[in-house]
Regions:
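Bacterial Sec-dependent N-terminal signal peptides
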Residues: 1-23
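Intrinsic disorder/low-structure terminal segments
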Residues: 7-12, 41, 64, 85
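General helical structural elements
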Residues: 7-8, 55, 130
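A subset of signal/propeptide-processing and intrinsically disordered low-complexity segments
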Residues: 12-14, 48, 57, 71, ...
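Accessory carbohydrate-binding/adhesion or oligomerization-edge regions at the termini
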Residues: 19-67, 141-156
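Accessory beta-strand-rich segments of carbohydrate-active enzymes
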Residues: 23-34, 77-156
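Short, solvent-exposed beta-strand/turn "edge" segments of beta-rich domains on protein surfaces
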Residues: 72-76
Length: 156
């Protein structure tokens, strides 16, 4: 079985909340992840994990077959970038308060919106919120850089 220590990229829901009458826009389509060994972006499923994304793109062998899991121990030692683009309506842009909300970022990650660092996450077991009103545009890009939890812990 794949070790739970690996980088499990879990975005249960990345959403935008705009106040007034609460409006919610779920951002779980169009995600891609960057595979450094191939210097290429690949399709990703959010919510999901890096292991399932690598498997669905045929970049790793089935970890449940034979001793393949032993050959996949490198995955939790890598950093992984995930990104997507999304648009918001003029109505949302006019709202006074707009937040980006993540339920489950595993574990160490920097979150960027339109190239600006919003926050750094260090705990998967909480909700993360950021005021995005100052950087939100009609067309936007989120980039999430996940750092190897194993490497972080080993460096302490």
């Amino acid at each position: 079985m794949i070790k739970k220590i690996g980088i499990f990229v879990l975005f249960f829901f990345a959403t935008i909340h705009a106040n007034a009458q609460l409006q919610k826009q779920t951002i779980n389509n169009g995600w891609k992840f960057y595979y450094a060994k191939a210097s290429k972006w690949y399709a990703a499923t959010v919510p999901g994990t890096i292991h399932t994304d690598l498997l669905s793109n045929k970049l790793i062998a089935d970890p449940y077959f034979g001793d393949n899991e032993k050959k996949l121990q490198w995955i939790d030692k890598e950093n992984w970038d995930y990104k997507t683009s999304f648009t918001v309506s003029h109505k949302i842009l006019q709202q006074k308060n707009i937040e980006l909300v993540f339920d489950g970022l595993d574990t160490y990650a920097d979150i960027f919106l339109n190239g600006k660092l919003l926050f750094s996450a260090d705990n998967m077991f909480r909700q993360w919120r950021a005021n995005i009103k100052p950087v939100l545009k009609s067309r936007n890009e989120i980039l999430i850089r996940f750092y190897s939890a194993k490497n972080k812990v080993d460096s302490i």
